[in-house]
């Protein structure tokens, strides 16, 4: 009898623990990098993995260059392979300008392609986490559901090294992907020199 009570108690505790561990997937609950320093963030970043949004998007060989001008304004250029009409691969150049918000890690990013067939828009650009020297995790939600979760998002895992992230950085990034409710939603980005 005592065994049955212990088993029921453990089952109840497990149920309580699992319900308390449910994630809050509302975009407003997502944390970003505290005390973000865009000057330290500037420089070259290689995209190692990405979660795609709806529509045409850079496929692979994605390299981004962030700069901060003398007035503190951040801008970026990115290059990567895009597949058009399901069979035509081209290297696309993208340009972005950033508007600061109250949170130093949250920006509005106006972007456009150098070629007219590329997308343009004005998306959120959040730096979720970075150590500035090894890894960075970017997130953008283009459209919210009524419940505050994201209907159309994209995200990049960046590395300063084109060969990838060290294991300790991979562990941090994986946890932050879970925090964004995007675990197992990313695909690896190859860097094979297509746009070199």
Curated annotation (Swiss-Prot):
Belongs to the calycin superfamily. Lipocalin family. One of its GO terms (cellular component) is clathrin-coated vesicle. Its main location: secreted. The keyword Disulfide bond applies. Retinol-binding protein that mediates retinol transport in blood plasma. Delivers retinol from the liver stores to the peripheral tissues. Transfers the bound all-trans retinol to STRA6, that then facilitates retinol transport across the cell membrane. GO terms for molecular function: protein domain specific binding; retinal binding; retinol binding; retinol transmembrane transporter activity; signaling receptor binding. One of its GO terms (biological process) is positive regulation of insulin secretion. Substrate binds at residue 119. The keyword Disulfide bond applies. This is Retinol-binding protein 4. Keywords: Disulfide bond, Retinol-binding, Secreted, Signal, Transport, Vitamin A. InterPro entries: Calycin, Lipocalin_ApoD, Lipocalin_CS, Lipocln_cytosolic_FA-bd_dom, Retinol-bd/Purpurin. PROSITE patterns: LIPOCALIN. It is found in: Secreted. It comes from Gallus gallus (Chicken). It comes from the Eukaryota. Disulfide bonds join 25-181, 91-195, 141-150. Residues 1-21 form the signal peptide. Interacts with TTR. Interaction with TTR prevents its loss by filtration through the kidney glomeruli. Interacts with STRA6.
């Amino acid at each position: 009898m005592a065994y049955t009570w212990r088993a029921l108690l453990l089952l109840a505790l497990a149920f309580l623990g699992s319900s308390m561990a449910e994630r809050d997937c509302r975009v407003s609950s997502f944390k970003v990098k505290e005390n973000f320093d865009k000057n330290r963030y500037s420089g070259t970043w290689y995209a190692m993995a990405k979660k795609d949004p709806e529509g045409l998007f850079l496929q692979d060989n994605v390299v981004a260059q962030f700069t901060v001008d003398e007035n503190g304004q951040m801008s970026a250029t990115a290059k990567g392979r895009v597949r058009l009409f399901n069979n035509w691969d081209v290297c696309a150049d993208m340009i972005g300008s950033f508007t600061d918000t109250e949170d130093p890690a949250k920006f509005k990013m106006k972007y456009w392609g150098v070629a007219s067939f590329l997308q343009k828009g004005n998306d959120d650009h959040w730096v979720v986490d970075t150590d500035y020297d090894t890894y960075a995790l970017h997130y953008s939600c283009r459209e919210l559901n009524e419940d505050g979760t994201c209907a159309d998002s994209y995200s990049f895992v960046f590395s300063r090294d084109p060969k990838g992230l060290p294991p300790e950085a991979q562990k941090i990034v994986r946890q932050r992907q879970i925090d964004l409710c995007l675990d197992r939603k990313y695909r690896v980005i190859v860097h094979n020199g297509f746009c070199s």
